[in-house]
């Protein structure tokens, strides 16, 4: 069976999903081709940086305000460093989980 679409997206990860959303919202017929059966486990995949939050906002995907994170904490032995996310004109001053 063959099907014709306006936009074929290879890979259903973050970039492919964003491309598919934008294409569909622009009126294109879209097909996403993903080799994996479903999503995969990724240890660091739950944390969103301010850049990722801005990208989701640009796609009109809501972020639950109760799951905001204000920065990073790094621990090496007994040393602990905390770094707040800086707020810029391009990105919010928070990430999300």
Model-derived features: positions:
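Short, functional N-terminal and low-complexity linear motifs
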Residues: 16-25, 68-74
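Conserved N-terminal helical subregion
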Residues: 2, 54, 67-68, 73-97
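Short amphipathic alpha-helical segments, especially helix-boundary/capping motifs
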Residues: 26-32, 47, 75-82
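Glycine-rich FAD pyrophosphate-binding loop
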Residues: 8, 12, 19-44
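Generic secondary-structure boundary signal with a strong preference for alpha-helix termini
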Residues: 28-29, 35, 57-58, 64, ...
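N-terminal FAD cofactor-binding segment of flavoenzymes
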Residues: 40-76
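Gly/Ser/Thr-rich beta-alpha loop segments that engage phosphate groups in nucleotides
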Residues: 13-18, 47-49, 95-97
């Amino acid at each position: 069976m063959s099907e014709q679409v306006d936009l074929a997206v290879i890979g259903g990860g973050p970039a492919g999903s964003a491309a598919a959303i934008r294409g569909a919202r622009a009126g294109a017929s879209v097909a996403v081709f993903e080799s994996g059966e479903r999503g995969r486990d990724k240890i660091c995949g739950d944390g969103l940086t301010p850049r990722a939050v801005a990208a989701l906002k640009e796609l009109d995907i809501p972020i639950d305000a109760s799951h905001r994170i204000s920065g990073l904490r790094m621990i090496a032995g007994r040393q602990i460093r905390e770094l707040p996310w800086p707020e810029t004109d391009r990105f919010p001053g928070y990430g999300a989980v």
